[in-house]
Amino acid sequence: MRRAKLDKNATSNAVAYCSATGRHNLSATHASRLAFSVFSHPNVKAFLKSMEKETIDDMIMGRDELLSELTDIASTTIDDIVQIVHSSDNMMNVKRGRFIQDLSRSLLTT
C-alpha cells in the first residue's frame, strides 16, 4: 500500500491527527477517517466550541497585565518569600504539641 505524504495530500484534520498521535506512517485516507471519527465525537465538538477565538484571546496576556506582573516580580523582597524566625519567637513542635523554649537547642535535637 502506497503511503501518501500527509502534508501535501491530506486534509488539515488528518495532518493534525498524525501530528498529535505521532503516527506518520498512515495513508492520507486512513488518517482522514480516523481524524473524522475523533472530530465528530460530541465531547470533542463541545471542547473545540469552547476554545473559540474569543476564549483564546482572553488567555493572551496584554501589555499592561504583563507590565503589572513584571512590576510585582521586580518589587518582591526576601521577606515576601522567606519567613525569618528569631530565637525569641515562640514556635511549636508539631510532633510533640509543645512550645519550643530554646530554639537553638531544639533545632539541634530535632
Curated annotation (Swiss-Prot):
Gene Ontology MF terms: DNA binding; nuclease activity
The record's disulfide annotation reads none
Print the keywords alphabetically. Answer: DNA-binding, Hydrolase, Nuclease, Viral genome packaging, Viral release from host cell
Q: Which residues bind DNA?
A: 12-31, 27-46
Residue ranges spanning the membrane: these are none
Query: What function does the entry list?
Result: This protein may possess the specific endonuclease activity required for cleavage at the pac site.
Under which name does UniProt file this protein? Putative packaging signal terminase
Q: Which organism is it from?
A: Vibrio phage CP-T1
